[in-house]
Amino acid sequence: SEPTMQKPRVLMMAAGTGGHVFPAIAVAQALQQSGAQVHWLGTLVGMENELLQHYDFSYHAINMQGLRGNGIKRLFKAPSTLLKATLAAIKIIKTNKIDIVVGFGGYVTAPGGLAAKFCKKPILIHEQNAIAGMSNNYLSKLANQVLEAFPNTFTELPSSKVMTVGNPVREAIVQVPPPKARIDVNDTSPLKLLVIGGSLGAQALNNHIAPTLKKLESMPDAKPWQVRHQCGKNNQEATQAVYSEAQLQSTQYEILPFVKDMAEAYSWADVIVCRAGAL
């Protein structure tokens, strides 16, 4: 009988924001469907902990936090934190016999990438933004292959190492019916507005959507609105206050810190207002 091919063991690295985590989930699902064994390297406190509960990936958490804007004390602790996190990642790679490491960004990718290099494992990274984040910028020098969503993100690297591939999208999002199939122009029910500020929220949207809706209400032949406003987990009270202050009459609204099921939200909406970002 023919020898059975061993399933490749892939370590995904993505943490911190939905912009890193959601595209990584899309790739992880595709890898899993093609027979790979998917492991995930995340942090102890990042949003990826909650997001990944619905998926069948082996989750490994290490203690790693960001360095930007967090004071001099953390900066002095940074080398020791990075070293400990890298050693923890090396142990994870060796214990689980990882074959390849795939990084999508977030602070966890720095120790994970260093660990992969130490263990002589191939590194592939994907950058979702037009301008690379700090971790991916550093890791691009160590990576065997660099994937970018937008052209010319990594102009300093040899072109043979970089491939422009766009952003991975989860299957559930791809299957959202097109507007023509969902929206009836003769429908007189309220227009459904979805406001998406990204996983951390967007201040401009949180401050200006409610006053804008108030102006729309005062227009002749104004249609009523039904609003779902995703404001970021630390902005719920402030955004609620902006809506209360606007004293909306015909608008129904719901303030959400985070939208877990984006496919359902997209299907529900007639109009979407979102900030520019990775996705």
Q: Over which residues does each language-model region extend?
A:
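Conserved nucleotide-sugar phosphate-binding/catalytic loop shared by glycosyltransferases and other
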Residues: 7-15, 34-80, 231-235
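Short amphipathic alpha-helix
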Residues: 20-31
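Active-site-proximal region of nucleotide-activated glycan assembly enzymes
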Residues: 37, 47, 58, 117-179
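Donor-nucleotide binding loops and adjacent catalytic segments primarily
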Residues: 46, 51, 55, 178-274
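An aromatic- and histidine-rich active-site surface loop
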Residues: 46-50, 100-119
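An amphipathic, basic-hydrophobic alpha-helix
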Residues: 71-100
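Alpha-helix C-terminal capping/helix-to-coil transition sites in glycosyltransferase folds
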Residues: 95-97, 141-142, 264-268
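Hydrophobic acceptor-binding patch used for acceptor engagement in glycosyltransferases
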Residues: 101, 271-272, 279
